[in-house]
Amino acid sequence: MKKSLFAAALLSLALAACGGEKAAEAPAAEASSTEAPAAEAPAAEAPAAEAAAAEAPAAEAPAAEAPAAEAAATEAPAAEAPAAEAAK
């Protein structure tokens, strides 16, 4: 259940980011007016789900890079210490 809530949140963020909220409402309105487009509604949702899945790794990438940047920051003073001793 947590995964579905997380996926729904990502989907809503993706739709809000690309302005697709208005586009997502149009197929829903068509589906309610006739019975045939109801079969098309899941197909229309698939690209949005793929977009959310594509954005998930991009959102995780900065978090993965942050520890590497922190590690470089902590290693820099240690690397400077031998250089300072060599200069003496």
From Swiss-Prot:
Biased composition range(s): Low complexity: 25-88
Sites of N-palmitoyl cysteine lipidation: 18
Domain of life: Bacteria
Membrane topology: Lipid-anchor
Region ranges (13 X 5 AA tandem repeats of [AS]-[AT]-E-A-[PAS]): 23-87
Subcellular location: Cell outer membrane
Lipid-anchored residues (S-diacylglycerol cysteine): 18
Signal peptide start-end: 1-17
Protein name as annotated: Outer membrane protein H.8
Organism of derivation: Neisseria gonorrhoeae (strain ATCC 700825 / FA 1090)
